[in-house]
């Protein structure tokens, strides 16, 4: 502050450093406190500001005083300061400032109760414009971010690697499968998440976890070749399919409250009924890992993708192969059904998206370039919008037929391992190799309009555009805010100027 110029130079340089640091910290605390309370600048701050300006001499006066001091032969710069001079002056200033601050704070509270029409409120409003705009806006932005209500639950962090996530169909519960064979059940909410229970189900990695359609049972498939069915109410084991496969089970798909399918690392697919002990049927049409299985609402066909590049379709009622696609020179990792069950889209290890007409799964009808990085996960958000993710750690949204990149839904620091969406379609959950689960509110997709084939678009910008759920912001948003600010200021100036008088 300017008043420091009137103090003598202390003999120890550290004293001056400590004094400046304390005063800087005090000023920062005052600004933060004022912003948190949500009030204007207090009269005490205004008085201190005025005192500082009064205590600071004019340029010419300061020059004259410096000349008089330098001409004084009795001044010794190496002499020790008297302990009473600076300390007493500082204590008096602090005491006077404290008493003045208390009085003006009480007056300000009275003025606030009376309304903003008082002179103190007017002077505070005037001096608020004199503050540093950058500092003021920064503090307000921080406080606004803190007070802004959450739109999604906070992150869940585990010590063990998370292999799969699954939302409960009716309750705000999410199941997290881990590499040590346990399943953690969390109750999630915007205010916080609560661990309900941990179920020890497998001796090896639990690769897939699913709820039945009625939400009564929890099904898990593991590397130990077993399938476990757990009753959620009693937390007891309902059924154990020991050695359900000859190889490690990789995927599990629930068809309804009784039927489910499993696929293993060797390409075998089995269909099960909870009311029976043995599988309904078993087919092996590929030689590599089953990466995903899916059915539509009619549940007549069971589709399976595999790591050796095949899309295989089974007729459930006939219990036999329906059709198998031509082989692809890439892994088929994931798929989703869109356009009223008229389109099937498959994601590959080369980042491509193949589109099939429903029922014609021998060869794709369209190929989209995708994101140019391996697509290992896909979740339908709406009937025309999909979320895809993979090794780059980004969750991207894309429009199906016509294909368009819509932007980035969310990010992880490491490759993404699993994706799921809740029953309402508003909340997306993702887990990564960093042992974390993050939630993304994707309700805004309900307002997305349909994209036409002849719509103009910029593919480069769309691929890097951050959507509202993303933790990152777009550079263009900063300039758009500035433009909006300028427009608002121009409107205010026009309103203040009023109608012009014609000559």
Curated annotation (Swiss-Prot):
Residues 1-21, 35-132, 483-503 are annotated as: Disordered. InterPro entries: WD40/YVTN_repeat-like_dom_sf, WD40_repeat_CS, WD40_repeat_dom_sf, WD40_rpt, WDR55_POC1. Pfam families: WDR55. One of its GO terms (biological process) is defense response to Gram-negative bacterium. WD repeats lie at residues 157-196, 201-242, 244-282, 285-324, 327-366, 411-450. Signal peptide: none annotated. The keyword Coiled coil does not apply. Keywords: Repeat, WD repeat. PANTHER family: WD REPEAT-CONTAINING PROTEIN 55 (PTHR44019:SF20). This is WD repeat-containing protein 55 homolog. It comes from Drosophila persimilis (Fruit fly).
